[in-house]
């Protein structure tokens, strides 16, 4: 189909991956966006796209400008996507596309993961081009894996010393061929060649936030469930050992809240004039963290006493011998104990099926890296983004939403 030529009264956003931790935050912040100047407009319409059924998701998004369209499988190709979206009100007015969809199934090998994710970005872009002739900007979110974080876990090194800068080279072989983000960016470069729209890459570390469904990339709820169920079994005040390593316990890193991430991506999308298409930008809350600082704070939110990992030193491990931090204290300790998890759900009147439903990927990715990975924010500052967020407060905010949804007690 050929998109109709229109002049939308104000920007319209299309969000692929709308019910993920980033996508939900994007939709919420797009709806909250206020026009404080000609270059920061209010979005007249926000169209969220997801694959899974959207009923009973507890989105907490009530705005007549918002529509969530489910049943969109990007792996089925652009024609399938167009068929689902073509009747959506305002789809022909889409000006800004936010691509935060991702397939990260544990069953996929590196080659499969790359193939699937490249196919998804192809479908998303080609469908948007067919549906709207007003497309101006596409924002694609990747991650700091482009700097070699995964490579460092497999014996490789980072592409540059911390603070990590966007101009760093790609990781060398064989890790380069295993990185899905490089393939995604190469495909977007190809798809955008000769087009009137531009695209930009956003690179966060771990994202803190609420999402209304189970998702393998949501570290926030996995950490909350880990600590909540641990407190249920071991009691208030029990010491809980950090399930990482002595090296990762002291490494410096940066996280980002879903609101901070969304605000930056919206700022970038609406301040893209004069930028080179394909540019990459780091984003974080702006504070520098270590697990030795964050773990005790997180544990305290659930009535526990956070202590260091085995071998971290006498000070970090103080109190473990008093009981409660020995034995099955790694990230996987709740898995397989269905009886205890069901009892936890019943006694706390939370949604069924969440107890013990933790993400191995999230724990490994956030608690196992042994290299400093602070992100340089110089490029973000150069385009006028000076906002900061507090990481501990971001966890508090997200966990409050999970409690409201009766996922956490």
Curated annotation (Swiss-Prot):
Residues that coordinate or bind NADP(+): 49, 68, 195, 288, 290, 299
Pathway: Mycotoxin biosynthesis
Gene3D superfamilies for this protein: NAD(P)-binding Rossmann-like Domain
Coiled coil start-end: none
Name of a matching Pfam family: PRISE
GO molecular function: oxidoreductase activity
Disordered: annotated span: 306-332
Record protein name field: Short chain dehydrogenase sirS
